[in-house]
Regions:
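Iron-sulfur (Fe-S) cluster-binding modules
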Residues: 1-18, 33-41, 66-95, 100-250
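Thiamine diphosphate
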Residues: 21-31
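Short gly/pro/ser/thr-enriched loop/turn and capping motifs at secondary-structure boundaries
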Residues: 48-53
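Active-site-proximal loop->helix
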Residues: 56-57
């Protein structure tokens, strides 16, 4: 038996099944439920499998209507009412968030998820200094050029949400000068709480560290730059599903 196989046809007696991608149509549901029958452990890999990711951007009326009118004509799979996480249809043993998860996280998920050590949030792995006397008045981002490599990106006017995002990725984005967009999902401090609590915490961080007007901040936090990942916070809170235990999220 090969070590790694990419297929919808799952052989018998498989130790671990890695599932990536959201569940968007009835064919996805069929393949997913069929695949998990012959495996011992299921790992949901990446933002799409856990919360829909990029495909959730297609959950708009005009997109659904287009597929409904053309699906029967071209014998296409039927769209579901929205993009669903994997655990809407099957049980998941471990969640591996990230867009994408790093090689280190993949190794930990396969070899020793309980023994993996990570900081509480991305800020704990970033290494940049937070300054009390440097408070930007507006979100400027790269308008002022490349950021100072030593100073916190929030202090420099970047929309960075590393304070509330779970660690483990080793902060490659912020170390390279790009703000964290939250692709790893909420840190353990918020993972079993309502999504409104996480959003309010992000707002408080910016209120404490910046002089950015509340209206500008609220608009920025709901912008396309962040919405693709921040919307996933509500999926961790459960909604009509069971709340995801932080012990099952790497």
């Amino acid at each position: 038996m090969p070590l790694v196989v990419s297929t919808h046809r799952i052989p018998e007696d498989i130790e671990v099944l890695l599932i990536s991608g959201g569940v968007r149509n009835d064919e996805d549901v069929y393949n997913l439920q069929r695949a998990v029958k012959n495996v011992k452990r299921v790992i949901a890999v990446g933002t799409c499998a856990i919360s829909g990711g990029v495909t959730n951007l297609g959950d708009r009326d005009e997109v659904r209507e287009l597929f409904r009118t053309q699906a029967k004509r071209y014998h296409l799979p039927q769209l579901l009412n929205k993009t669903h996480p994997v655990d809407s249809f099957v049980d998941v043993d471990l969640y591996l968030p990230g867009c994408p998860p790093t090689p280190e996280l993949f190794m930990a998920a396969l070899m020793d998820p309980q023994g993996f050590k990570a900081s509480a949030n991305v800020c704990g792995e970033c290494g940049r200094r937070k300054l009390n006397d440097m408070k930007p008045d507006h979100i400027t981002g790269f308008e002022k050029g490349s950021p100072d490599p030593e100073i916190c990106l929030v202090n420099q006017g970047f929309l960075c949400v590393g304070t509330s995002t779970r660690g483990g990725c080793r902060a490659p984005c912020t170390r390279a000068g790009h703000p964290c967009v939250g692709c790893r999902g909420p840190s353990n401090a918020f993972i079993e709480r309502e999504s409104a609590v996480w959003f309010e915490n992000i707002q408080r961080v910016f209120e404490r560290m910046t002089n950015i007007p509340p209206e500008e901040l609220n608009q920025a936090l709901r912008s396309p730059q962040l919405s693709m990942f921040l919307f996933q916070f509500s999926d961790y809170a459960g909604g009509d599903r069971r709340i995801r235990s932080k012990d099952k999220v790497l």
